[in-house]
Swiss-Prot record:
UniProt similarity note: Belongs to the universal ribosomal protein uL4 family.
Name of the molecule in the record: Large ribosomal subunit protein uL4
Keywords tagged on the record: Ribonucleoprotein, Ribosomal protein, RNA-binding, rRNA-binding
Start and end residues of each stretch annotated as Disordered: 44-77
A GO BP entry: translation
NCBIfam families on file: rplD_bact (TIGR03953)
Transmembrane segments: none
Organism per entry: Methylibium petroleiphilum (strain ATCC BAA-1232 / LMG 22953 / PM1)
Pfam families listed in its UniProt record: Ribosomal_L4 (PF00573)
GO MF term list: rRNA binding; structural constituent of ribosome
Lineage: Bacteria, Pseudomonadati, Pseudomonadota, Betaproteobacteria, Burkholderiales
Biased composition (Basic residues): 56-70
Matches recorded under InterPro entries: Ribosomal_uL4, Ribosomal_uL4-like, Ribosomal_uL4_dom_sf
Gene Ontology CC annotations of this record: ribonucleoprotein complex; ribosome
């Protein structure tokens, strides 16, 4: 599989050979969907909680007598039918949202995403991404010159200057290959991979 190598103006300067095991796989929509959903589910904190009729603050006093008033019978004000009452099926921190995905499935799903991005022209290669100073303005100007607005950069090494310069850009994420995830790959409009990162991705996903 050949990928475009971009220059500093964002134009295709040449081609770079990339492993077919990572960038030449067939697209498996069902597998990609499963991998993305599992990633989102496993990222949940699972701390949401609501109160049921037992835990909501209430009085155990019967609101009115059982018969003779003409109104519907009521036992206590914590009933889910009442305003201020508990929930019938409350959310609980004990809920388990985790989804298990086998390692082979995850690797195949990631490779399918990389391959589809390459086919759509949303993935390109650069020699390296470096900035001399930890200034956001410098990195923003570099991406503007390349015509990139929403970009995920997978660099073989992220130094301190690059990390500090990129962290305040809303539509830019700079990561090392080991931190690549399916949601980020799908979310950003363009994915830039450095030459050194290609080999690391091959070791991870091939």
């Amino acid at each position: 599989m050949e990928l475009e190598l971009l220059n500093e103006q964002g134009q295709a300067a040449s081609k770079v050979d990339a492993p077919d095991t990572v960038f030449g796989r067939d697209y498996n929509e069902a597998l990609v969907h499963q991998v993305v959903v599992a990633y989102q589910a496993n990222a949940r904190q699972g701390t949401r909680a609501q109160k049921d009729r037992q835990t909501v603050k209430h009085s155990t006093k019967k609101p009115w007598r059982q018969k003779g008033t003409g109104r519907a019978r009521a036992g206590m004000t914590s009933s889910p039918l009442w305003r201020g009452g508990g929930r019938i099926f409350p959310n609980s921190p004990e809920e388990n949202f985790s989804h298990k995905v086998n390692k082979k499935m995850y690797r195949a799903g990631m490779a399918a995403i990389f391959s589809q991005l390459a086919r759509e022209g949303r993935l390109a290669v650069v020699d390296s991404i470096k900035v001399e100073t930890p200034k956001t303005k410098a990195l923003a100007a570099k991406f503007k010159a390349m015509g990139l607005e929403s970009v995920l950069v997978i660099a073989d090494e992220v130094d301190e200057n690059l990390f500090l310069a990129s962290r305040n850009l809303a539509n830019v994420l700079v990561i090392e290959p080991r931190y690549a995830d399916p949601l980020s790959l799908v979310f950003y409009k363009k994915v830039l991979v450095t030459k050194g990162a290609i080999e690391k991705l091959k070791e991870m996903l091939a």
